[in-house]
Amino acid sequence: MVDQNPKRSNEPPVWLMFSAGGMVSGLAFPVLILILGILLPFGIISPDNIIAFSHHWFGKLVILALTIFPMWAGLHRLHHGMHDIKVHVPNGGLIFYGLAAVYSFIVLFAVIAI
């Protein structure tokens, strides 16, 4: 018989943020390293272009994605890594995911202020 009142979990939204962070880290960071670590120092790209991009609405969305999602992925890995090595933090989910949420709001307001 099917349980009519299944227990709900907070894992699906957290896994969504975790997987988005992994994808952003894997796909966008090499490009970011190329642009900021190689092309910008050698003068191939002007700093004015990067500043103009960061002031555009699409640039702000990119900055948000490049900062918020990897933080969720990192704190999710840290939370589950602590369990793997048998270090159980009381209210660990609340602490780690709460830190990620606070960081997300701080970054959101900082990027809006650009």
From Swiss-Prot:
Its main location: membrane. It is a multi-pass membrane protein. InterPro entries: Fumarate_red_D, SQR/QFR_C/D. GO terms for cellular component: fumarate reductase complex; plasma membrane. The keyword 4Fe-4S does not apply. It holds the Pfam family Fumarate_red_D. GO terms for molecular function: succinate dehydrogenase activity. CDD domains: QFR_TypeD_subunitD (cd00547). It is found in: Cell inner membrane. GO terms for biological process: fumarate metabolic process. Belongs to the FrdD family. This is Fumarate reductase subunit D. The gene is frdD.
